[in-house]
């Protein structure tokens, strides 16, 4: 047997023990809470004493920039994979198949394994492979399997789930506390569908949205009281964040982006369409019709930006994925795309350019690993995954985040930095990569 083959056998023998063996010493658990659609400044026109005290006792970001496209499932998956959307593949809230033209709504898509399990490994599975137990409560992507592995503890919301029930919210918090205490879970992701639902229905500037933010704040207070009541304050780090913001929909008739009214455009030229979902649109023209459809649409409306897939702005980190169609488009802030008929009537919407301030969201963190009274500069949500891996002391999967971006918010010595065991894992992976090229 040659030297390369011997090294390969040794590396393959050692690597599983390093990855799946006893983890480095960890003292702290982690709870990631997402309040869907919580715009970065929602706490500025409402009294939020619990979020305020959390900032005083922990870390607050001026705001957090979500990934593009600013939709619920794609942005939530970025948080737990550390990847831009074009790299993790959950490119839309809706499952779609361009061959069969099947399109499934948001709730149905939550249970479609192949939509989520497409090559990226979320933090639940990474942590479990390194000896930890994890949980997901209503968090998008948390109730399917990845490479055959399921999250240790999981709950999935029903199709007709009432997002607004504050009593249920407290019950969900109680369940999560039991997971930490009775099931020895180290990581839980907890999802609430508000204030997104209220923002959609009534608009982000409405009194109803303001009232819902007060409910969110009361729930934050209940959560922090529960942590203290269960004596977890010294062993549990808490992160509260969101997926995206919200903006008011422009409903002025003369400004509507309506495909069925565009001159020289016909759906007879289209093989597949994904429209009528906020400001994002995807089209597959019929064979030989790409240039014609593109030329008709590219200047069809001053608020609509239409691109060939290969020309879509690279800074969005969105179009370079097999699931993205040959024609891709988005509209300006406040303008939604109507297809064959007008079926969108929300007063609030998201999905827009992630550089628009209305799409920015919140980040708060408190616990034994975080500094107190620190406000940090804005950052991208893609970096949160690396932070969570540091807090849990686990080796991250390959990702697009930078582990140094958020490290300054941690107390000195509190981050579970890579141990010698983790360096050995990296070394062995490097050996395997090199050997694969010569064998």
Curated annotation (Swiss-Prot):
Q: Where is it localised?
A: Cell membrane
Q: In which tissues is it expressed?
A: Expressed in liver and small intestine.
Q: Which cofactor does it need?
A: Zn(2+)
> Could you state one GO biological process linked to this protein?
lipid digestion
Tell me, in one coarse class, where this protein mainly resides. Answer: membrane
Q: Which UniProt keywords apply?
A: Cell membrane, Glycoprotein, Hydrolase, Lipid metabolism, Membrane, Metal-binding, Signal, Transmembrane, Transmembrane helix, Zinc
Q: Which reaction does it catalyse?
A: a sphingomyelin + H2O = phosphocholine + an N-acylsphing-4-enine + H(+); a 1-O-alkyl-2-acetyl-sn-glycero-3-phosphocholine + H2O = a 1-O-alkyl-2-acetyl-sn-glycerol + phosphocholine + H(+); 1-O-octadecyl-2-acetyl-sn-glycero-3-phosphocholine + H2O = 1-O-octadecyl-2-acetyl-sn-glycerol + phosphocholine + H(+); 1-hexadecanoyl-sn-glycero-3-phosphocholine + H2O = 1-hexadecanoyl-sn-glycerol + phosphocholine + H(+)
Residues carrying sugar: 97, 118, 143, 165, 264
Determine if Coiled coil is one of this entry's keywords: no
Kindly indicate where the leader peptide sits in this chain.
1-21
Keyword Nucleotide-binding annotated: no
Q: Which residues form the active site?
A: 72 (nucleophile)
Residues binding Zn(2+) 2 are 196, 200, 350
The protein's name is Ectonucleotide pyrophosphatase/phosphodiesterase family member 7
The organism of origin for this protein: Mus musculus
Q: What's the name of its gene? A: Enpp7
